[in-house]
Design a protein with these regions (language model features):
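Pocket-lining segment of extracytoplasmic ligand-binding domains
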Residues: 1-83
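Serine/threonine-rich low-complexity intrinsically disordered regions
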Residues: 5, 24, 82, 104, ...
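Helix N-cap / beta->alpha transition motif
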Residues: 21-22, 38, 114, 140-146
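Residue-level preference for alpha-helix termini and adjacent loops
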Residues: 34, 40-41, 109, 134, ...
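Secondary-structure end/capping motifs
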Residues: 45-132
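Conserved C-terminal helix/tail region of periplasmic/extracytoplasmic solute-binding proteins
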Residues: 119-169
Length: 169
C-alpha cells in the first residue's frame, strides 16, 4: 500500500512496482502546482508572474483542447521522453495530471484559486495536529493573477498547437 502523489505512483508503475493507492480522498484534492511568493515580491514582479502564469495557462489550454498534442510534445526529444518508457503508464499519468490542471466542470478559466481545497488542507492539518486553528484563506491566497493568466487568444493557441502537431506529431 502507498500514499503519495500521482508522479510517485507513475514512477513506481513504470518500474513494474504494483501498489494499492491508499491516499486519503481529502489529500487527492489538495492544491497542485502551488506557488508561494512573498506579497511584496509578488507585486514587485507582477508582470513576470503574469507572463509565466499566462504561458502555463496556454499549455493547460492545449491539453484541454487536445491532450494528444501534449502527449506528443512530452514524447519529443526536447520534451520528457523518459516519462514514456512504458506507454500505458505515460498515458495514465498524463490523464491523471490533466485532471489536476483543468478548471472545474463548467468553468473556462485556468489557474483559479481553489479555496475549498485549501480549507480541506487546513482541516487535515488540524486532524493530525500540525495546526491548532482554522486559518483565513484570505491571509495567504490571492486572485490577483487569474485575469492575466487567462488573457490570451484561445483560437490562436489552438492553431499554433495544431501547426506544431502537423509538423512534429
Amino acid at each position: 500500500a502507498f500514499a503519495g502523489s500521482i508522479s510517485d505512483l507513475a514512477a513506481l508503475a513504470t518500474k513494474g512496482v504494483v501498489v494499492r493507492d491508499i491516499t486519503p480522498p481529502s489529500a487527492k484534492v489538495a492544491p497542485a502546482n502551488t506557488y508561494a511568493v512573498n506579497g511584496a515580491t509578488m507585486m514587485d514582479n507582477y508582470d513576470k508572474y503574469c507572463r509565466f502564469l499566462k504561458a502555463y495557462s496556454m499549455g493547460v489550454h492545449v491539453g484541454n483542447y487536445n491532450l494528444d498534442i501534449i502527449a506528443a510534445m512530452s514524447k519529443a526529444p526536447d520534451g520528457s521522453p523518459a516519462q514514456w518508457e512504458v506507454e500505458s503508464v505515460g498515458n495514465s499519468y498524463l490523464a491523471a495530471v490533466a485532471k489536476l490542471q483543468l478548471p472545474p466542470e463548467g468553468d473556462t478559466l485556468y489557474g483559479l484559486v481553489a479555496e475549498s481545497a485549501w480549507l480541506t488542507v487546513n482541516n487535515d492539518m488540524k486532524m493530525i495536529g500540525a495546526v491548532d486553528a482554522d486559518y483565513d484563506t484570505n491571509d495567504y491566497l490571492t486572485h490577483v493573477f487569474e485575469g492575466c493568466a487567462n488573457n490570451f487568444d484561445r483560437a490562436a493557441v489552438e492553431a499554433a498547437a495544431d501547426a506544431w502537431m502537423a509538423k512534429n506529431g
